[in-house]
From Swiss-Prot:
Protein name: Chaperonin GroEL 1
Native organism: Rhodopseudomonas palustris (strain BisB18)
GO biological process, one term: protein refolding
E.C. code: 5.6.1.7
Main location: cytoplasm
Gene: groEL1
Cross-referenced InterPro entries: Chaperonin_Cpn60_CS, Cpn60/GroEL, Cpn60/GroEL/TCP-1, GroEL-like_apical_dom_sf, GROEL-like_equatorial_sf, TCP-1-like_intermed_sf
Subcellular location: Cytoplasm
């Protein structure tokens, strides 16, 4: 085991604080509508330009191990806020740095770190309660657009795209963000359920111009196994032919005799049919087939349930108003499933999302949820250069998470105003001793920093602006740094999602309190350079040897 270096007390906290400040200073320049960009060097390709706090934080690694520990702890604040609310990472970083800075001063002055921590925890509880109390539900599409615009750094076009997307696919629907091939940003909405499997054979195509299958009022057979023998299918096919409606077969695979017969019947015109491979793999495939069955009001045919193919009746088939299948995707619109069944399935998937610990599983479950709940919207972000597209895509991602958070927990006045107002409530908190009172005071001071930093980034005097905002009693009164005017933030459309503000203060205080209570730090000693690896002139790679 290699030797370690240990730092104690003031020395440890000073090093840590330096790291916190370096990271916070790099991140805080991006805050607010007049925040600046940060350029990140990439080991390959062009540098990346971003205004996203968490992206900047993730790039920072410091040479000094002890400074780096401080920076990494605060980076965790930004990451946690991004995971929980998807936005507010810069606010969280600014808050954490402010709490650590004031806390370190108090500890150096001889106060008890554990009492300071208890005071900080008390203050955060009171702040969260105040935020929740003053939170307003999002009622209109216009408010969703405003949240998106603020989070996308004042880009109204992005705000509008997001509110349109949420209007079309619902609050639970999936909105994905991709890079466009053109200059324009566009919105593409897929209604109903879409999965990434196309037709098994091109002979099923009904619309030759678009090379796709289009069926109206179709039956859907959902089968878990491969279909290779036609005999077991015949009774069902005859029943479907008599109804005159088309049939879509979703199965693990359709091959051999079964596929050949379906194609021949399709070409002769007697049977409108198309076959598609089932989406997903393994257990996920079973779950997705069950989703399709619930959406279309059918039954997933599975030998586990003791249902054999030859016993399948028309009543077991799903139905949909429209089915479209191209080479790569199948879309089912207006399935005939019962609303109550679909809602129960949605609730079940939501419960699984809450329980899962894997990010990959969570993403897949959210996709399934969206397909059941409404549809999928794709925002394709355009721009003149790849660097511009990437920077804009970062902002669209932030804005998308912010609008989701706003729908979930409501909205508050933006521009750091909600935290400023909450700081006034902290004057009334009863504490057990003076050190705890100082802990509350540390949070109270820190809460003014987001509003102050937004003003500083806009070239204003932060202290003057915070003072003027607090002079007025009106809750949503604040400073619009874009226009340089004071007024009602909500009426001006400057609003933040409650969830984002709440996550920012909770995560910032959690990590900052841990940093304040740190008394020792341990890191590996830097490796001493040995001569063996060098290449001095004429050494031929044998560094340190005399010739």
């Amino acid at each position: 085991m290699s030797a370690k270096e240990v730092k104690f007390g003031v020395d440890a906290r000073d090093r840590m604080l330096r790291g916190v400040d370096i990271l916070a200073n790099a991140v805080k320049v991006t805050l607010g509508p007049k925040g600046r960009n940060v350029v990140l060097d990439k080991s390959f390709g062009a540098p990346r330009i971003t205004k996203d706090g968490v992206t900047v934080a993730k790039e920072i690694e410091l040479e000094d191990k002890f400074e780096n520990m401080g920076a990494q702890m605060v980076r965790e604040v930004a990451s946690k806020s991004a995971d929980l609310a998807g936005d507010g990472t810069t606010t969280a970083t600014v808050l954490a740095a402010a709490i650590v800075r004031e806390g370190a001063k108090s500890v150096a002055a001889g106060m008890n770190p554990m009492d300071l921590k208890r005071g900080i925890d008390l203050a955060v509880e009171a702040v969260v309660a105040d935020l929740v109390k003053n939170s307003k539900k999002v009622t209109s599409n216009e408010e969703i657009a405003q949240v998106g615009t603020i989070s996308a750094n004042g880009d109204a076009e992005i705000g509008k795209f997001l509110s349109d997307a949420m209007k079309k696919v619902g609050n639970e629907g999936v909105i994905t963000v991709e890079e466009a091939k053109s200059l324009e940003t566009e919105l593409d909405v897929v209604e109903g359920m879409q999965f990434d499997r196309g037709y098994i054979s091109p002979y099923f195509v009904t619309n030759a111009d678009k090379m796709r299958v289009e069926f109206d009022d179709a039956y859907i057979l959902i089968n878990e196994k491969k279909l290779s023998n036609l005999n077991e299918l015949l009774p069902l096919l005859e029943a479907v032919v008599q109804t005159g409606k088309p049939l879509v077969i979703v199965a693990e695979d359709v091959e051999g005799e079964a596929l050949a017969t379906l194609v021949v019947n399709r070409l002769r015109g007697g049977l409108k049919v198309a076959a598609v491979k089932a989406p997903g793999f393994g257990d996920r495939r079973k779950a997705m087939l069950q989703d399709i069955a619930i959406l279309t009001g059918g039954q997933a045919i599975s030998e586990d349930l003791g249902i054999k193919m030859e016993n399948v009746t028309l009543a077991m088939l799903g139905k949909a108003k429209k089915v479209m299948i191209d080479k790569e995707n199948t879309t089912i619109v207006n399935g005939a499933g019962k609303k109550a069944d679909i809602e129960a399935r949605v609730a079940q998937i939501k419960a699984q999302i809450e329980e899962t610990t894997s990010d990959y599983d969570r993403e897949k479950l959210q996709e399934r949820l969206a397909k059941l709940a409404g549809g999928v919207a794709v925002i394709r972000v355009g721009g003149a250069t790849e660097i511009e597209v990437k920077e804009r895509k970062d902002r669209v991602d932030d804005a998308m998470h912010a609008t989701r958070a706003a729908v979930e927990e409501g909205i508050l006045p933006g521009g750091g105003v909600a935290l400023l107002r909450a700081s006034e409530q902290l004057k009334r908190i009863k504490t057990q001793n003076d050190d705890q009172k100082t802990g509350v005071e540390i949070v109270r001071k820190a809460l003014s920093w987001p509003a102050r930093q937004i003003a500083i980034n806009a070239g204003e005097d932060g202290s003057v602006i915070v003072g003027k905002i607090l002079e007025k009693d009106q809750y949503s009164y604040g400073f619009d740094s874009q226009s340089g005017e004071y007024g009602d933030m909500v009426k001006k459309g400057i609003i933040d999602p409650t969830k984002v503000v709440r996550a920012a203060i909770q995560n910032a205080a959690s990590v900052a309190a841990l940093l304040i209570t740190t008394e020792a730090m341990i890191a590996e000693l830097p490796k001493k350079g040995n001569a063996g690896g060098g290449m001095p002139p004429g050494g031929g790679g044998m560094g340190g040897m005399d010739f």
